[in-house]
Structures are given as C-alpha cells and as structure tokens.
Regions:
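Glycine-rich active-site/cofactor-binding loop and its immediate structural neighborhood
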Residues: 82-124
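N-terminal subdomain of lithium-sensitive/metallo-dependent phosphomonoesterases centered on the IMPase/IPPase/PAP
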Residues: 1-91, 162-178
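Acidic beta-strand-loop-alpha-helix segment within the catalytic core
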Residues: 108-183
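Conserved protein kinase catalytic core
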Residues: 77-78, 95-98, 129
Length: 183
C-alpha cells in the first residue's frame, strides 16, 4: 500500500476508534453491566461485543477483501493464515475494564506478511489515541524529566499477579525497599 493510502486508513481508524469511546464508556459507567466468561475463562463484556460488532461492520464495509482476526470471534478451527489481515481487540484489558481501573484500550492493526503496517490504540477512559504507520518515522514527544523517587518502580500486571510476583514483593518489603507498581 502506498503511504497516502496508509495515512487515509489511519485517519479512518482514528475516527472509528474515537466514535467507539462514548459507547464503551456508557457500558463502563453502568454499575450493573454483566460479565460472562469465554471457554478459556477470560471475561467478556457487552463493551467487548459492541466494540467487536462496530469495528467489524466498519472494516467489512470499507475493506471487504481483508480478513479480520478479532479476539472476540477468532477460533483456530478452519483458520487459514493470510498474508494481510486486520488484528482487532475491541477491549484489551477486559479484567481492568471489569475492575474499573481505566486501564483498558481498543486496538486495531493492519498486518502484512507477519508485520504490523499500521495501528491505532485508543484509551476511552482517558480520551486518548495513539497511532502509527510502520513505514514512517515515528512521531517524537518531549518527555518531562523528574527527580527519581526512592521507590523502586516495578512493571507488573495487577490482574495477573503470580505467586512468584507476590513473593518478590514480600522480599523487597522485608528488606526495606519502597515499591511503586506500574501496571
């Protein structure tokens, strides 16, 4: 695909992702939304399924010749690998969505020959979108420099903490180390 086509696609996906935010947040803010579980035990919500439906409707309308692999409908049975496909996760971080931590995203990517070509990640809870095209130089953003605190910063999933993770945190605590967990 040519660069101008990719820029048009990324713009369309950004608009689509932004249009999903109010729908997803309406469910997120509902105190009584239901959660069910897939065969693998992972949770799925009405927001997952609504996002899935709206994203697939858009992609099938505008890009009908490109197959779609979505977390909410993918099964390996009968799957034929494609050189080009959409990779979709309507709510990445469903456990965080259910726990109302705000740490969940909507992800849409175009994959060609096993490599990501472009992608959009939207964070409805903070009203932000990140996007990129792999053939272009990434946009740079100046980072704010801060004085480091005395706390160790540890990147660890809040939803998937293991016994080993807990033992490690206990070890640090017993040895007087301050810890800040970043999820």
């Amino acid at each position: 695909m040519q660069s101008k086509n990719l820029e048009l696609i990324i713009s369309q996906l950004e608009d689509l992702t932004l249009s999903l935010f109010p729908e997803i947040l309406k469910i997120y803010e509902d105190k009584d939304f239901k959660t069910r579980h897939k065969k693998d035990g992972s949770p799925v919500t009405k927001a997952d399924m609504l996002g899935h439906k709206l994203i697939l409707k858009f992609l099938n309308k505008h890009y009908p010749d490109i197959p779609i692999v979505s977390e909410e409908s993918f099964t390996q049975k009968g799957y034929k690998p494609a050189k080009e496909f959409w990779l979709v996760d309507p709510i990445d971080g469903t456990k965080e969505f259910v726990n109302r931590s705000g740490e969940f995203t909507t992800n849409i990517a175009l994959i060609q020959n096993g490599q990501p070509v472009l992608g959009v990640v939207g964070a409805p809870a903070i009203n932000k979108i990140w996007s990129g095209i792999s053939a272009q130089t990434p946009k740079t953003t100046k980072l704010k420099v801060t004085t480091p605190s005395s706390a160790l910063k540890i990147v660890m999933s809040k939803s998937h903490k293991t016994v080993i993770d807990s033992a490690f945190l206990n070890f640090l605590d017993k040895n007087g180390k301050k810890v800040k967990i970043i999820s």
